[in-house]
């Protein structure tokens, strides 16, 4: 059994690397034990962990390799109820430290402005999306889940704001993802006269940290994960515009992983790599642009590896196209 999680190991190396001269190893151990929830680990143990990592890292550097500290699996655009089977991720089972869900978990099909020949109940979508995410966490077994919202998720708030008085709309969250991950929700089945409570996912996995960003982007190490509402039909142009936006905002990053476009590709602009990660949904059933002569939608996802300093190891990145 491992004494520390990958995230804790990263914190150990970070603190030990920057250890001031006036701090002893006992001081470091006391600080880390407090941060890790009251552990009682000796300074000798922390020192040996750090020394072992440095030994392995130096050996890998001598071979021209870099030690992996954090493995990130980024999935976006599941568009429940059009999601792909979870066993599509079978090669990554047990190989993920952070599961990053990059928006558009729910399709919000019934409340979209697009024409539709049938409707899927928003409540049905939310219940199914919650179950899908639970199954994915159990299957992939990450240590942490980081969630951003997408333009389809934000339809929830926009629809309420358009169709309800402000006073009523203020009773509801911005997206259905808050209900799924943070707040939980009740389902009032009027036909059957039942009331069912669905606990938030954050309460179901005590050993998995759930981080709902409540934003359309987040940053992990040197990588920004984003799901904007803007769209450009040019190849990788949406990702390029996003890169310039974040640069203008003063953010420091080397990698940009973009959801939203349902395309798969990567490109280098200077020292920055931009990636469009594709959709983790069955695009044949979710064809918004049918007949509009856009490039066809692509299914895919991204698997990133970072070193102890949060720098992405590019040669170990996998951009996976599924169709």
Model features per residue range: what roles?
Residues 163-239:
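Active-site-proximal loop/helix segment associated with metal-binding centers of metalloenzymes
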Residues 75, 80-191:
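Core catalytic region of metal-dependent phosphoesterases/phosphodiesterases
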Residues 74-76, 98-104, 146-151, 225-228, ...:
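Active-site neighborhood of phospho(di)ester-bond hydrolases with catalytic His/Asp-centered motifs
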Residues 16-34:
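Short, charged amphipathic recognition helices of the HTH superfamily
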């Amino acid at each position: 059994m491992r004494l520390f999680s990958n995230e804790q190991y990263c914190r150990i190396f970070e603190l030990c690397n920057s250890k001031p001269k006036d701090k002893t190893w006992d001081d470091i151990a006391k600080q880390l034990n407090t941060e890790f929830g009251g552990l009682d680990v000796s300074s000798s143990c922390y020192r040996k962990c750090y020394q072992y990592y440095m030994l392995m890292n130096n050996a890998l550097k001598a071979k021209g390799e870099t030690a992996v500290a954090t493995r990130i699996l980024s999935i976006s655009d599941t568009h429940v109820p059009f999601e792909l089977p979870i066993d599509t991720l079978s090669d990554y089972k047990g190989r993920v430290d952070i599961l990053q869900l990059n928006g558009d978990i729910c399709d919000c099909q019934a409340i979209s402005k697009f024409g539709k020949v049938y409707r899927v109940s928003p409540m049905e979508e939310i219940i199914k999306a919650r179950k899908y995410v639970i199954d994915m966490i159990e299957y992939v077994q990450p240590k942490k889940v980081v969630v951003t919202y997408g333009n389809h998720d934000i339809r929830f708030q926009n629809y309420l704001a358009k169709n309800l008085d402000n006073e009523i709309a203020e009773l509801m969250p911005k997206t259905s993802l808050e209900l799924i991950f943070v707040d939980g929700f009740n389902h009032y089945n009027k036909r059957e006269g039942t009331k069912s409570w669905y606990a938030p996912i954050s309460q179901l996995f005590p050993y998995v940290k759930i981080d709902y960003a409540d934003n359309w982007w987040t940053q992990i190490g040197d990588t920004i994960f984003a799901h904007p509402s803007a769209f450009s039909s040019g190849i990788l142009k949406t990702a390029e515009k996003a890169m310039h936006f974040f640069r203008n905002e003063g953010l420091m990053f080397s990698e940009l992983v973009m959801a939203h476009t349902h395309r798969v590709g990567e490109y280098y602009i200077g020292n920055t790599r931009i990636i469009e990660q594709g959709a983790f949904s069955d695009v044949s059933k979710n064809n918004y642009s049918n007949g509009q002569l856009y490039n066809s939608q692509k299914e895919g996802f991204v698997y990133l590896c970072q070193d102890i300093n949060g720098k992405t190891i590019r040669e170990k990145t996998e951009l996976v196209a599924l169709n």
